[in-house]
Amino acid sequence: ELMRIQPDIADAPDARELPPVCGQVDYNDVSFDYAGGVNVLSHIDLHIAPGETLAVVGPSGGGKTTLCQLLPRFYDVTQGSVCIDGIDVRTVTQASLRRCVGVLQQEVFLFADTIRENIRYGRPDATDAEIEQAARCAEIDREIRAMPDGYDTYVGERGVMLSGGQKQRLSIARLFLKNPQILILDEATS
């Protein structure tokens, strides 16, 4: 049954690979409505230069997460455009887009696998040395090595064997390993 469900967001028939990017992000007159017409964002204009950091703050339910989810096309805009280096994200393949954008979600997702494989998910061809370096950068390496099975420790379904902070750091290590040109941290403590 699940395999027959069509995704809500699909590549355009003429979608092309996103070329290597500098990382300029533009939201041009962006509005977004959820199904049923619930408006969340109206006429947003943002320009984020490569290397620039932007913090979006506001109350819960104010649309911050939705704003973050438009860039990697977890949702499509209702009006306007979201562009990387002047290229509308709707005109490129989702796979090429998501290779250059890394997202640290509020809700960390871990697989029922080892710590090593959960970090490796950021870049499946990574070596063990690269995985360990990413963990050091995320300041979780010492904690991992202190576990009885180290990097081969099984984390359980959705990481139930780990604390919330450990899950967050593993997710950060995954992003360091991926090393995307554009990084979205949808979590204040990140």
Predicted regions and their residues:
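ABC-type nucleotide-binding domain
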Residues: 4, 9-11, 16-190
